[in-house]
C-alpha cells in the first residue's frame, strides 16, 4: 500500500511547479475513519533543479525528500501542515462524506504568508484525499480533477489485477511451479511501476496537451472501474477470503501463458453458477421432505449431458424441483379452502380435510331432503275419493267402455282434477286495512273458481266501495286478489265489516261452485240414461238382433249401472 501511494505521488508530480500548484499532499484515511494521516507530498521547489541545473542555492529541510532542492515558500507551507487531521468537522470531513471535490478560494492565511488570496483543492480518492494548494487564485478546472482521478484509478486497477493474478496462480498450480512464475510476475510488476515518469514535462504542457485530450467517456469509464475494484478489495486473498475468489468477476485469464490484465474472467465456479440459477428459479427452498424425484431428472435432457460430472448437483436440483412442485400444489389447495387458520403446511392440510367433511355432510343433508320431498309428492299424487268395486278402484268411467261410450274421454281427467282440488281445498284469507278516512286496502287469497273475481267486484260494489286499483295473481289452484277501494261519502263502512262480508262471500262461492258441479253431473247422468233407453227401445222395435247389437246392449246396461254408481259416489 505504501508503494502504491508513492507511485501515485510520482504520477501527480507534474502538477506542481513554479507556474503550477505549490504543493500536492496525499492524505490516507485511517482504519477507524476518525482522521486522515500524512502519506507523502510533492513540493513545487523541486522544479528549480531541473530549470537551473546548478546547486547555487542553499538546501534546507523539506518534507518532500524524494529530491533535494532549495528551500522555497512551498517548503514553508508544507512544514506547517500537521501529520494528521481529525475528521470531526471541517472541509476534509465534508469532502469525504459527500465524495465531492472541494475547490476553495481562501482570503485569510497565517501571518507567514504574504498573499491574501490562495486556492485549495481537495479531491476524494479511494481510501483518502489528494490536496492541491496554490498561493494565487486558480479558476476551477475539471481537467485537473480528471487527471488526478484517472491516475488514481489506473493505479488501483493495476494493483488489484496483479494481486488477483498472483492468487490465481497460487491456487491453480503446484507448489514447485510457483517460484519462477512469481518472479516473472514480480518483474512485470516492477516494469509497470518503473515506467518512465514525465519529470521533465512542465505543468503548462500538461494543461495544454494532455488534460484536454481526456474525454468524458474515458473519465466515466475510469470512475466505474475504480468503484468496482474498490468494492472487490474485500474479497482479495490477502484478506483471507479465498473461497470468494470464484465469485470475483475480475479474475485474470491466461491465453498461451500470457496473462490478460483487467479483463473479466469467465472461469467461475460451475457449482456456484448452478446454485445461483436454481435459487433464482425457485425463489426459496422449503424444508420438510426427505425423498427425491429421480424420474424428472432422467427425462430432462439437460441433465443427461452432465451425467458424468455433477451427480451431487443433479440430486440437489431434483430435490429442489420436487419441493417446488409440492409447494405449488399446496398453494393451489390453500386457494380453494375458504377458511385457513394458519399458513403452515399442517394447518393447511387440516383445514382442507375439515372443509371436505363439511361438504360431504351438506351433500348428504340435501340428498335426504330431496328423498323426503319425492316421497311426499308421490303420496299427494295418489287418487283420492275413489271407490272400490270388486277389487278395482273406480274414479270415473270404466276403461273397457271408453270406446263404446258417447261421453267424451276428457271427463275422466276433469274428475281427477276435481278430486285433487277437493283434497287441497283451503280456507279463504281476507285482509282489510284502512289507509285513511275513505280508502281501504283489500287482499283476498282463495282457491281459483270461475267467476270468483266478478263476484268479488260485485260484493265490493254492494258494500258501497268503488274500486280504484285491482291486481290479481294466480299460482296453481290459488289466486291472490288485491284491491284498493274508496268508499262513497254517504256510506258508513268499517274495515271489519268489509272483511267479514268478503270472507262470507268467498266461502259461499266455493260451496256454490261445488253444488253447481254436482248438479251438472246429475243432469248429465240422467241424459245419458234416457239416451241409452231410447236406443235400446229402437233396436227392439226394429227387430234387429245382430250379435254386435247384443254386445251394444250389454255395454249400455253396464254403463248405465256404472253411471248410477258414479252418481252415488258424487252425492
Curated annotation (Swiss-Prot):
Entries under SUPFAM superfamilies matching the protein: HLH, helix-loop-helix DNA-binding domain
Subcellular location(s) of the protein: Nucleus
UniProt feature, compositional bias: Acidic residues: 368-378
Basic and acidic residues bias spans: 275-284
Stored CDD domains: bHLH_AtAMS_like
InterPro entries: bHLH-TF_ACT-like_plant (IPR054502), bHLH_dom (IPR011598), HLH_DNA-bd_sf (IPR036638), MYC/MYB_N (IPR025610), TF_AMS/ICE1/BHLH6-like (IPR051358)
Keywords: Developmental protein, DNA-binding, Nucleus, Transcription, Transcription regulation
Chain spans, region Disordered: 275-321, 365-390, 536-571
Family annotation (Pfam families): bHLH-MYC_N, bHLH-TF_ACT-like_plant, HLH
Tissue expression summary: Mostly expressed in closed, post-meiotic buds, and, to a lower extent, in pre-meiotic buds. Detected in leaves, stems, and flowers.
GO cellular component: nucleus
UniProt main location, coarse: nucleus
GO BP: anther wall tapetum development; pollen development; regulation of DNA-templated transcription
Polar residues bias: start-end ranges: 381-390
All residue ranges annotated as the bHLH domain in the record: 310-359
Role noted for this protein: Transcription factor. Plays a crucial role in tapetum development. Required for male fertility and pollen differentiation, especially during the post-meiotic transcriptional regulation of microspore development within the developing anther. Binds E-box regions in the AHL16/TEK promoter.
PANTHER family found in the cross-reference section: TRANSCRIPTION FACTOR ABORTED MICROSPORES, TRANSCRIPTION FACTOR SCREAM2-RELATED
Protein name: Transcription factor ABORTED MICROSPORES
Source species of the chain: Arabidopsis thaliana (Mouse-ear cress)
Phylogenetic lineage: Eukaryota, Viridiplantae, Streptophyta, Embryophyta, Tracheophyta
Name of the gene encoding the protein in the UniProt record: AMS
Amino acid at each position: 500500500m505504501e508503494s502504491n501511494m508513492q507511485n501515485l505521488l510520482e504520477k501527480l508530480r507534474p502538477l506542481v511547479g513554479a507556474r503550477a500548484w505549490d504543493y500536492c499532499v496525499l492524505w490516507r484515511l485511517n482504519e477507524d475513519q476518525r482522521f486522515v494521516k500524512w502519506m507523502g507530498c510533492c513540493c513545487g521547489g523541486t522544479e528549480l533543479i531541473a530549470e537551473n541545473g546548478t546547486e547555487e542555492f542553499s538546501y534546507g529541510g523539506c518534507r518532500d525528500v524524494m529530491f533535494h532542492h532549495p528551500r522555497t515558500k512551498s517548503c514553508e507551507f508544507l512544514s506547517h501542515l500537521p501529520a494528521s487531521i481529525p475528521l470531526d468537522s471541517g472541509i476534509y470531513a465534508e469532502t469525504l462524506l459527500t465524495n465531492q471535490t472541494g475547490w476553495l478560494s481562501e482570503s485569510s492565511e497565517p501571518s507567514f504568508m504574504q498573499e491574501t488570496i490562495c486556492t485549495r483543492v481537495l479531491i476524494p480518492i479511494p481510501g483518502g484525499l489528494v490536496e492541491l494548494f496554490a498561493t494565487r487564485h486558480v479558476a476551477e478546472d475539471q481537467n485537473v480533477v480528471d487527471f488526478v482521478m484517472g491516475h488514481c484509478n489506473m493505479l488501483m486497477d493495476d494493483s488489484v489485477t496483479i494481486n488477483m493474478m498472483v492468487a490465481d496462480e497460487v491456487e491453480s498450480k503446484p507448489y514447485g511451479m510457483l517460484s519462477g512464475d512469481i518472479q516473472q510476475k514480480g518483474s512485470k510488476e516492477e516494469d509497470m511501476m518503473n515506467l518512465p515518469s514525465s519529470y521533465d514535462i512542465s505543468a503548462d504542457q500538461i494543461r495544454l496537451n494532455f488534460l484536454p485530450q481526456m474525454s468524458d467517456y474515458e473519465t466515466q469509464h475510469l470512475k466505474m472501474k475504480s468503484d468496482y475494484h474498490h468494492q472487490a478489495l474485500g474479497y482479495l486473498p490477502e484478506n483471507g477470503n479465498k473461497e470468494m475468489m470464484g465469485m470475483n468477476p475480475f479474475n485474470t485469464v491466461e491465453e498461451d501463458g500470457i496473462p490478460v490484465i483487467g479483463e473479466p474472467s469467465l472461469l467461475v465456479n460451475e457449482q456456484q453458477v448452478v446454485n445461483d440459477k436454481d435459487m433464482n428459479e425457485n425463489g426459496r427452498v422449503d424444508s420438510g421432505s426427505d425423498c427425491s424425484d429421480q424420474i424428472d431428472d432422467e427425462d430432462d435432457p439437460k441433465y443427461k449431458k452432465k451425467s458424468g460430472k455433477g451427480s451431487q448437483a443433479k440430486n440437489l436440483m431434483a430435490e429442489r424441483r420436487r419441493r417446488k412442485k409440492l409447494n405449488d400444489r399446496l398453494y393451489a389447495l390453500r386457494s380453494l379452502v375458504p377458511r385457513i387458520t394458519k399458513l403452515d403446511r399442517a394447518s393447511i392440510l387440516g383445514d382442507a380435510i375439515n372443509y371436505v367433511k363439511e361438504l360431504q355432510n351438506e351433500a348428504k343433508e340435501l340428498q335426504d331432503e330431496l328423498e323426503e320431498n319425492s316421497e311426499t309428492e308421490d303420496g299427494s299424487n295418489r287418487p283420492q275419493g275413489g271407490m272400490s268395486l270388486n277389487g278395482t278402484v273406480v274414479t270415473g268411467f270404466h276403461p273397457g267402455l271408453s270406446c263404446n261410450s258417447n261421453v267424451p274421454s276428457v271427463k275422466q281427467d276433469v274428475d281427477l282434477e276435481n278430486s285433487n282440488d277437493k283434497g287441497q281445498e283451503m280456507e279463504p284469507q281476507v285482509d282489510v286495512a284502512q289507509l285513511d278516512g275513505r280508502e281501504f286496502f283489500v287482499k283476498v287469497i282463495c282457491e281459483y273458481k270461475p267467476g270468483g273475481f266478478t263476484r268479488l267486484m260485485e260484493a265490493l260494489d254492494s258494500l258501497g266501495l268503488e274500486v280504484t286499483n285491482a291486481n290479481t295473481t294466480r299460482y296453481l289452484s290459488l289466486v291472490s286478489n288485491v284491491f284498493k277501494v274508496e268508499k262513497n261519502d254517504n256510506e258508513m263502512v268499517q274495515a271489519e265489516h268489509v272483511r267479514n262480508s268478503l270472507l262470507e262471500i268467498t266461502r259461499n262461492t266455493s260451496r256454490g261452485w261445488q253444488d253447481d258441479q254436482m248438479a251438472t253431473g246429475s243432469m248429465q247422468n240422467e241424459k245419458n240414461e234416457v239416451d241409452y233407453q231410447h236406443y235400446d227401445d229402437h233396436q227392439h222395435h226394429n227387430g234387429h238382433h245382430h250379435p254386435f247389437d247384443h254386445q251394444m246392449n250389454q255395454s249400455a246396461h253396464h254403463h248405465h249401472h256404472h253411471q248410477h254408481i258414479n252418481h252415488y259416489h258424487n252425492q
